[in-house]
Regions:
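Short loop->beta-strand "edge-of-pocket" segments that line small-molecule binding or catalytic clefts
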Residues: 29-43, 50, 131-148
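Alpha-to-beta junction loops
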Residues: 66-67, 84-93, 137, 170, ...
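Extended ligand-binding regions for polar small-molecule ligands
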Residues: 54-64, 124-125, 131-138, 145, ...
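Periplasmic-binding protein-like
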Residues: 34-38, 113-117, 202-238, 257-264
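A ligand-binding cleft/hinge motif common to bilobed small-molecule-binding domains
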Residues: 81-84, 92-103, 184-208, 212-215
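Acidic, polar ligand-binding/catalytic clefts
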Residues: 58, 71-133, 146-147, 212
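Ligand-binding cleft/hinge of the Venus flytrap
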Residues: 57-65, 109, 135, 143-168, ...
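Short helix-initiation/N-cap motifs at beta->coil->alpha
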Residues: 70-81, 164-176
Length: 264
């Protein structure tokens, strides 16, 4: 017969051993869609994304252990289907007005603002009035984007027929078309132009940049209804990144504004 003391010791050892065998609760996997949208996401399908989204994902994962954020490559047109079918849980750097109106989601304000601007070749006598009227001008735009001047209709046929636009999948190509006289105006994000000018400082003097803004990008994260993380929980993580300076570190170099307080 075991003595009470030996029995208690044995039970304690068993309890400790059982606890050691129980694995810690695994972090919940949150799949974030990554569609080519430079400088935010750059060719994610190639597996070496150098954009801002991977930096944000690294910061989110370093901040906590409850969720593991991972990137899932998608595309501008396919991201809607991937979202609805649950292949991705979240789309980041989005706007609810960019074709999401009929798709159930929760919108979380990222507290980030960028802008779409016009860029032309600098010529003697050409000033800001050049951007006032787009009629008759050859435009270079990014295929699939929702532009304010086109009433947010990304249809390629409409862009070509109504706005004499050349559609590409490269902002660099669009800017080079302007530099080489193959297009009159290119539309790019302020953040991308800032990065382009750093990489191509010798070309900066060739371009006339508009004061006119096609649209202001107020960025959101869109969460599907059954996402592993709630809008409130994700908002709290973003707040912590703002408070510890990570948001500023990631986005300020690209002239992406950190707004005073996210609008929820």
């Amino acid at each position: 017969m075991f003595s009470p003391r030996r029995l208690a010791a044995g039970l304690t050892f068993w309890a400790l051993g059982s606890a050691w065998c129980i694995p810690a609760l695994a972090a919940q996997l949150v799949r974030v869609g990554a569609a080519h949208f430079p400088p935010y996401t750059v060719r994610p399908e190639q597996g070496a994304d150098t954009g801002l989204l991977p930096q944000l994902i690294v910061a989110l994962n370093a901040l906590q252990s409850d969720y593991q954020f991972v990137l899932v490559p998608t595309s501008i047109p396919r991201r809607f289907r991937d979202f609805e079918q649950g292949r991705i849980d979240m789309a980041i750097f989005e706007n609810p007005d960019w074709g999401w109106q009929e798709i159930p989601h929760t919108a979380v304000d990222l507290g980030l603002e960028d802008a779409e601007i016009f860029v032309a070749q600098r010529e003697p006598g050409r000033g800001q009035s050049y951007f006032a009227d787009l009629k008759g001008k050859r435009l270079a735009v990014f295929s699939g984007y929702h532009y304010a001047f086109a009433h947010f209709n990304p249809d390629p046929k409409s862009m070509v027929e109504q706005f004499n636009a050349t559609l590409t999948y490269s902002h660099d190509s669009n800017l080079l078309m302007v530099a080489r006289g193959r297009a009159d105006i290119a539309l790019v994000t302020r953040s991308y132009l800032s990065d382009f000018m750093v990489r191509n400082a010798d070309m900066a003097a060739q371009f006339l940049v508009s004061e006119r803004i096609d649209q202001v990008y107020h960025h959101y994260a869109l969460l599907r209804p059954k996402a592993p993380i709630t809008g409130e929980a994700f908002s709290e993580l973003l707040k912590q990144l703002r408070d510890n300076g990570q948001m500023l570190k990631i986005f300020e170099p690209y002239r992406i504004d950190i707004t005073p307080a996210p609008r929820q």
